């Protein structure tokens, strides 16, 4: 497969980037998740980073990537509003998988944000987007800059939502390569991988949560709801990290 020049790709519009990566994406679609990781480590520039929200199925991508590159920095953008079970899950996985965990937070504390802006997540789509910009997007941009990340692994899957249904394996986002090794996995394959490797779902899975983010914008699944409707009051699916 071809080698790519990140600076040249960043000079192109999104459509041009997609066209330039189309052939290699066709080839990547035929590879296993492990082979995609190995290909990226060989053909894409370092530093390499892996992001995780430590959500319902987070153990899969964390285990898969760190088996191949154990010391890869694992970026968590901590809003300060995660479920207690999420913080416990983070500790458990960090210990079990010996993660090189790198935690980044907003420059303003949650209390200061509420004093300054009120509860942004109660202020419609505009408020949610401002909240995400402060607590997710800016810390992630800072993480990439601090760690010198040029290739970013993430655990998104097409099956999770309409906004992810057509994502390619490889793209350019935030000026870096972004590769999604398990993009084409379904829930059955996730379950099989977890079972095979003695890994667990997030603790809230057993309580009916299909997707887990902050306490104030995550709902337990109810009959008739899509997975997308369990986040951000159904107003939007993405927290901002995987947009743009």
From Swiss-Prot:
GO terms for biological process: hydrogen sulfide biosynthetic process; sulfate assimilation, phosphoadenylyl sulfate reduction by phosphoadenylyl-sulfate reductase (thioredoxin). It comes from the Bacteria. GO terms for cellular component: cytoplasm. Its EC number is 1.8.4.8. Pathway: Sulfur metabolism; hydrogen sulfide biosynthesis; sulfite from sulfate: step 3/3. Keywords: Cytoplasm, Oxidoreductase. It catalyses: [thioredoxin]-disulfide + sulfite + adenosine 3',5'-bisphosphate + 2 H(+) = [thioredoxin]-dithiol + 3'-phosphoadenylyl sulfate. Pfam families: PAPS_reduct. Disulfide bonds: none annotated. It is an enzyme of class 1 (oxidoreductase). It is found in: Cytoplasm. Catalyzes the formation of sulfite from phosphoadenosine 5'-phosphosulfate (PAPS) using thioredoxin as an electron donor. Belongs to the PAPS reductase family. CysH subfamily. This is Phosphoadenosine 5'-phosphosulfate reductase. The gene is cysH.
């Amino acid at each position: 497969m071809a080698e790519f020049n990140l600076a040249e790709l960043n000079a192109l519009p999104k459509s041009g980037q997609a066209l330039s990566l189309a052939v290699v994406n066709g080839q990547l679609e035929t590879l296993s998740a492990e082979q995609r990781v190995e290909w990226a480590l060989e053909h894409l520039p370092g530093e390499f980073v892996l992001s995780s929200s430590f959500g319902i199925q987070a153990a899969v991508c964390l285990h898969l990537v760190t088996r191949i590159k154990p010391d890869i920095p694992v970026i968590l953008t901590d809003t300060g509003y995660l479920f207690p079970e999420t913080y416990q899950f983070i500790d458990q996985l960090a210990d079990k998988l010996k993660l090189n965990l790198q935690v980044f937070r907003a420059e303003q504390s949650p209390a200061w944000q509420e004093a300054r802006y009120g509860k942004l997540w109660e202020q419609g789509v505009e408020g949610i987007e401002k909240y995400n910009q402060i607590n997710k997007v800016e810390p992630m941009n800072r993480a990439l800059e601090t760690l010198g990340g040029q290739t970013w692994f993430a655990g998104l899957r097409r099956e999770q939502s309409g906004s992810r249904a057509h994502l390619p394996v490889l793209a350019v986002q935030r000026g870096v390569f972004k590769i999604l090794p398990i993009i084409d996995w379904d829930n059955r394959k996730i379950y099989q991988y977890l079972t095979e490797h003695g890994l667990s779902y997030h603790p809230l899975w057993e309580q009916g949560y299909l997707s887990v983010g902050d306490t104030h914008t995550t709902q337990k699944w109810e009959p008739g709801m899509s997975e997308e409707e369990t986040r951000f009051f159904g107003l939007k699916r993405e927290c901002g990290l995987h947009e743009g």
